[in-house]
Each structure stands twice: as C-alpha cells, then as structure tokens.
Amino acid sequence: MPPKKTETKAADASAAAAPAPAAAPTSAPKTKSPSTHASYLDMITDAIVALKDRAGSSRQALKKYVRANNTLGNVTDNMFDSLFNKALKNGVDKGVFEQPKGPSGGTKLAKKVAKPAPKKAAPKKETKEKKPAAAKKEGAAKKETKEKKAPAAKKAAAPKKAAAPKKEVKEKKAAAPKKKAAAPAVADKETVLTKTKSGRVAKSTAKPAAAKKAAAPKKAAASKKAEKAEPAAEKA
C-alpha cells in the first residue's frame, strides 16, 4: 500500500509541470469600410435638382437616380429602401423637402424664405461721444457767465469816477467862507453925542468921512452956541 502513495504524488507533480493549454486567439475588431457615397439626404437632393420636375419627383424616380449615380456597395434592397425613406422623412421634417400632395405624391425642394435682416442696434459709442460734447457746452456756458460777470464788476466800479467831483464841491464849499472873510469888514458906526438947545444930550451915528467933512462947520457953530449958552447960564 505505501508504494501506491508515492506513485500518486509523482503523477500530481508531472501534471503540475505540464504547460497550460494556449488560450483561443481573440477575433480582430471589425472595421467599417468608409462609405464611397454622400449621405442619403444629399443624394436625394441631387436627384431632385437633376430631374427638374416642377410638380415634384416621385419616390420611384428618385430611387432609380440615386442607385444609378452613386456607388452604394453591398447594400440590400430592403436596407436601401429603409435608409432612403428615413432620409426623405427627415428632409421633410427639417424643411429641406416639400410634398404638396402628401407622402404618396411627388417630392421637391422647399422654397427658401428670406429671413428679415436683424435690425442693427444703434452703437453705444455715439451716446458716449455726445456726453463730452454736452460737458463742453456746459463749460463754455460757464466761461460765458464768468466773462459776463467780469464786465458787471467793472460797471460797479464806474461810480468811483463820479465820486471825484464831490471832493471838488467840498473844497469849493470850504473855500466859500474865505471869500466872505476876504470881503471888507463893515466898520462899526461911530456914535456922536450932541447937546440940544434944551440941554439934553442926543446920540447920533457918524456918517462916512465925506459926510464928516461936510458936517465939520456945523460942529463949529454948535461950539459957538454952547459958549454963548454957558455965560447965559452963569448969569442966571
């Protein structure tokens, strides 16, 4: 029995040393061959332009043109019909194609409606340029007001020239008393005491020098009368 155990161990070791079976080779990814034709939408558009049917080209006529003028490769009839119908429907939905009589009628290109040109907004730079112009106008107005104020100040200063004659008037008024003082002073009239016949003393104002000269003889006569009157008084 013990020899059997050794045999089993040797068999296990040989099995472990044996190389593992090689994995199956993976298949290379399938690459799609590039299409040698345009999209179905473009091919249908070219067919409509080439056929030039005013009422619209039929579906069968379009299919024949697409097959005859494009290399579609290994495409089955069923695949071609599904791709063609799908492209035609998408073109109608997008507004590229037009079917006036419905899906069973002819197909033609939709008329392009000219879109109105968007209105251009007024440039904002013009408003920015106008503001400095307004500021300049305000500055010019301020300068004009300043210039106007300056002549007003000059006009206010003008009365100073008119004030000069007042000094001359004052000087003339002050000079007026001098003229009065320069006038010859009136001499006080001299009073002369004379005695009347009754013996009373009478006061009389003296006349000017010329008058005094004329009155001189009268004084002599008066003195004679006084001398005569004194002896008479002594006798009495």
UniProtKB/Swiss-Prot annotation:
Residues 36-111 form the H15 domain. Residues 109-122 have a biased composition (Basic residues). Residues 1-36, 94-236 are annotated as: Disordered. The keyword DNA-binding applies. GO terms for molecular function: double-stranded DNA binding; nucleosomal DNA binding; structural constituent of chromatin. Keywords: Chromosome, DNA-binding, Nucleus. It comes from the Eukaryota. Residues 11-36, 153-162, 202-220 have a biased composition (Low complexity). InterPro entries: H1/H5, Histone_H1/H5_H15, WH-like_DNA-bd_sf, WH_DNA-bd_sf. Its main location: nucleus. GO terms for biological process: chromosome condensation; negative regulation of DNA recombination; nucleosome assembly. GO terms for cellular component: nucleosome; nucleus. It is found in: Nucleus; Chromosome. The keyword DNA-binding applies. Residues 1-10, 123-150, 165-174, 224-236 have a biased composition (Basic and acidic residues). Could act as an H1-type linker histone. Belongs to the histone H1/H5 family. This is Histone H1. It comes from Neurospora crassa (strain ATCC 24698 / 74-OR23-1A / CBS 708.71 / DSM 1257 / FGSC 987).
